[in-house]
């Protein structure tokens, strides 16, 4: 395990807001190809479409990976429930739950677009992982 990972009592020091995020931390900790990782260490400014203001987005993870080819690749990773990665179903448009889901999706999409631009500018990759990837 790489010293740069900051391991040991890692789960006391790292931020995770879901068990899925914790599961990803354990994966990072046990994967010898992951040379560095951190939780909510990167700050990406984005303009929120719901209020028009600039906010700060803290993606869930940063990782540095040694690919099979030997190339080093950096990733910014967001862990999200799959249902939050696509627009809500239009059939529910009149409900308060639909309105909340639509606002959440619009805000998330703005964050992810900003993250994609941030990563492209820095030769990094942006990934959204869902339960399909973690289980």
Say what each PLM segment does.
Residues 28, 59-63, 73-81, 115:
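Conserved catalytic cores of phosphodiester-cleaving nucleases, focusing on short active-site segments
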């Amino acid at each position: 395990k790489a010293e740069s990972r900051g391991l040991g009592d890692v789960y006391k020091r790292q931020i995770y807001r879901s068990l899925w995020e914790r599961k990803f931390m354990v994966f990072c900790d046990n994967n010898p190809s992951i040379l560095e990782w951190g939780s909510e260490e990167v700050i990406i400014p984005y303009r929120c479409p719901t209020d028009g203001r600039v906010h700060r987005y803290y993606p869930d993870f940063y990782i540095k990976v040694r690919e099979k080819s030997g190339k080093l690749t950096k990733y910014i990773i967001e862990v999200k429930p799959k249902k939050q990665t696509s627009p809500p179903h239009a059939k529910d448009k009149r409900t308060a739950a639909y309105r909340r889901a639509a606002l959440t999706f619009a805000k998330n999409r703005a964050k992810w677009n900003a993250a994609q631009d941030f990563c492209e500018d820095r030769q990094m990759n942006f990934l959204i992982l869902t339960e399909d990837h973690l289980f």
